[in-house]
Swiss-Prot record:
Catalysis: reaction(s): 3-deoxy-alpha-D-manno-oct-2-ulosonate + CTP = CMP-3-deoxy-beta-D-manno-octulosonate + diphosphate
Function statement: Activates KDO (a required 8-carbon sugar) for incorporation into bacterial lipopolysaccharide in Gram-negative bacteria.
Keywords on record: Cytoplasm, Lipopolysaccharide biosynthesis, Nucleotidyltransferase, Transferase
GO terms under biological process: CMP-keto-3-deoxy-D-manno-octulosonic acid biosynthetic process; lipopolysaccharide biosynthetic process
CDD domains: CMP-KDO-Synthetase
UniProt enzyme class: transferase
Record localization: Cytoplasm
Protein's recorded name: 3-deoxy-manno-octulosonate cytidylyltransferase
Any GO MF annotation of the entry: 3-deoxy-manno-octulosonate cytidylyltransferase activity
Pathway this chain belongs to: Nucleotide-sugar biosynthesis; CMP-3-deoxy-D-manno-octulosonate biosynthesis; CMP-3-deoxy-D-manno-octulosonate from 3-deoxy-D-manno-octulosonate and CTP: step 1/1; Bacterial outer membrane biogenesis; lipopolysaccharide biosynthesis
GO cellular component terms given for this protein: cytosol
Assigned EC number: 2.7.7.38
Length: 250
């Protein structure tokens, strides 16, 4: 990515304190730093653009800014991460200079720079509204696990699909690989603005998958295939695993 492209890309990291399974998750210590700071560091390593953390608590704001990163206070009552990043976008970039917004989840402290950069590749096609990531499933249990969201798509190349559907079911039927969706998104700014203006859709509510709102509205989502699923920290066991992974990198 050249400097001009980097200047037009904004990385937004939503951080929410009220996690049900791991309260205070953004401030959980991982190798001497709050988890949200570790995520911001991983995003900085990708070198794709300006980084802003969208927070909903003054303690998280203090942790992020104290580590030298930019933070924006957002409302506590957002129903989704996309609503939070949209509020942060309007506050962080009121003049509309950023053309692309990457949403890196705030619970991915071990993510490598590669997948963050890969999320931008599908947006090289001007017809693509939103880009996201996927990994080929190799674990048989994942194929039937409703917590593993599958991408059903039409191949554009060996490493890219046009998404036709996202589901918790085992799909598509028949022989062939299945793909595990990774919830990291790159939006064109206009696409994000359109998305948050839409009401939750029928299939979105049925599957509890927000991205279906975009597909039902006729928006195009392209999916880049990457090598591995980044660890999402949702439980104390995940937190311990993240600590082991980052300790090994030092």
């Amino acid at each position: 990515m050249n400097r001009e492209q980097s200047g037009k890309t904004l990385v937004l990291i939503p951080a929410r304190m009220a996690s049900t399974r791991l309260p205070g998750k953004p401030l959980a210590d991982i190798c001497g730093l709050p988890m949200i700071v570790q995520v911001a560091r991983r995003a900085a390593e990708a070198e794709v653009g300006r980084i802003v953390v969208a927070v909903d608590h003054p303690d998280v704001f203090a942790a992020v800014t104290g580590a030298g990163f930019e933070a924006i206070m957002t409302r506590v009552d957002h129903q989704s991460g996309s609503d939070r990043i949209h509020e942060a976008l309007l506050k962080a970039d009121p003049h509309g200079e950023a053309e692309i917004v990457i949403n890196v989840q705030g619970d991915l402290p071990t993510i490598e720079p590669g997948p963050i950069r890969a999320a931008l590749k599908p947006l090289e096609n001007p017809a693509t509204d939103i880009a996201t990531l996927t990994v080929a499933i190799t674990d048989e249990h994942e194929k039937t696990n409703p917590n593993v969201v599958k991408v059903v798509g039409s191949p554009l190349s060996d490493s890219r699909f046009r998404a036709l559907y996202f589901t918790r079911a085992t799909a598509p039927y028949g022989e062939g690989p299945l793909y595990h969706h990774i919830g990291l998104y790159a939006y064109r700014r206009k696409a994000l603005e359109t998305f948050v203006s839409l009401k939750p859709s029928t299939l979105e509510k049925r599957e509890s998958l927000e991205q279906l709102r975009a597909l039902e509205a006729g928006m195009r989502i392209d999916v880049e295939v990457v090598d591995s699923v980044p660890l999402g920290v949702d439980t104390p066991a995940d937190l311990d695993k993240a600590r082991r992974i980052l300790s090994a990198r030092v």
